[in-house]
C-alpha cells in the first residue's frame, strides 16, 4: 500500500474482532476504530457470497466514516449441504435471538443422515481505501475439517466444538489459542491481507 493510513474503521460491532484487528495493525502505527464511533447504521447483507457481503460492509463503513475500512464475512460450509449454512451461519436457526446452541443443533440434525461430513470454515476480509475504491483488497482463508456429531472442547464459540480437525485429532474448541491463531480461517485471511497491504 503506497500511503499508509493512520486510521481504519472496522465494519463490525464485535468487540473480539476489534481487539484482534487492533492488535494486528498496532505494530504498523495504524489505529483500528469501531464503526460505532461514527454511528454507522447496520449494513444490509443481501448477497449470497461472503465476498459480496464483506465488500458491501466495507464500502458502507468507508462511506459513513470517510476513512479506509475493513470488513469480514465468515461462516461454516458443509459439503453435503451444498455449502450451507454459509453466509447464514450466525443466524442459521433464526435470529431472535442468535444462538450458537440452536445453530449447532440444526446443523447436526441436517448432517445426521449424510455420509459426507466434510466441512470448512471460510473467512473473507475486504479492505477499501474509500467507498468507491475500484481496487478493493480481498483476502480469503479456508480451514478444512469434519463435522463431529459429539461436541468437545471449551476454547471456542460458534461451531467450534463440532468442527473436528483430523490432523490434530481434536475439535477447534479443543485447540489451544496459539495453534488456532496460526491455522484458523481468520488467521489465514489475516496473513494474506497483510501480504497484500504490503505494510
Curated annotation (Swiss-Prot):
UniProt keyword terms in alphabetical order: Hydrolase, Magnesium, Metal-binding, Nucleotide metabolism, Nucleotide-binding
Gene3D superfamilies given for it?
A: 3.90.950.10
Any idea of its EC number?
Answer: 3.6.1.66
Which co-factors does it depend on?
Answer: Mg(2+)
Q: How is the cofactor bound?
A: Binds 1 Mg(2+) ion per subunit.
Q: Where are the bilayer-spanning segments? A: none
| NCBIfam families named in the record | RdgB/HAM1 family non-canonical purine NTP pyrophosphatase
Protein name from the UniProt record: dITP/XTP pyrophosphatase
> Organism source for this protein?
Neisseria meningitidis serogroup A / serotype 4A (strain DSM 15465 / Z2491)
What lineage, starting at the top, does this entry show?
Bacteria, Pseudomonadati, Pseudomonadota, Betaproteobacteria, Neisseriales
Amino acid at each position: 500500500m503506497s500511503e499508509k493510513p493512520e486510521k481504519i474503521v472496522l465494519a463490525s460491532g464485535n468487540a473480539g474482532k476489534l481487539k484482534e484487528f487492533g492488535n494486528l495493525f498496532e505494530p504498523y502505527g495504524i489505529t483500528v476504530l469501531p464503526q460505532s464511533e461514527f454511528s454507522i447504521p447496520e449494513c444490509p447483507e443481501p448477497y449470497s457470497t461472503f465476498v459480496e457481503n464483506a465488500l458491501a460492509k466495507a464500502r458502507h463503513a468507508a462511506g459513513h466514516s470517510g476513512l479506509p475500512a475493513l470488513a469480514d464475512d465468515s461462516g461454516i460450509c458443509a459439503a453435503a449441504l451444498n455449502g450451507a449454512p454459509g453466509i447464514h451461519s450466525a443466524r442459521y436457526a433464526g435470529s431472535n435471538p442468535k444462538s450458537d446452541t440452536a445453530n449447532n443443533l440444526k446443523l447436526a440434525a441436517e448432517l445426521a443422515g449424510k455420509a459426507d461430513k466434510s466441512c470448512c470454515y471460510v473467512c473473507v476480509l475486504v479492505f477499501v481505501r474509500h467507498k468507491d475504491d475500484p481496487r478493493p483488497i480481498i483476502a480469503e482463508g479456508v480451514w478444512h475439517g469434519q463435522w463431529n456429531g459429539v461436541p468437545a472442547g471449551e476454547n471456542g464459540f460458534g461451531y467450534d466444538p463440532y468442527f473436528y480437525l483430523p490432523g490434530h485429532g481434536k475439535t477447534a474448541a479443543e485447540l489451544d489459542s496459539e495453534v488456532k491463531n496460526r491455522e484458523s480461517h481468520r488467521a489465514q485471511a489475516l496473513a494474506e491481507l497483510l501480504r497484500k497491504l504490503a505494510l
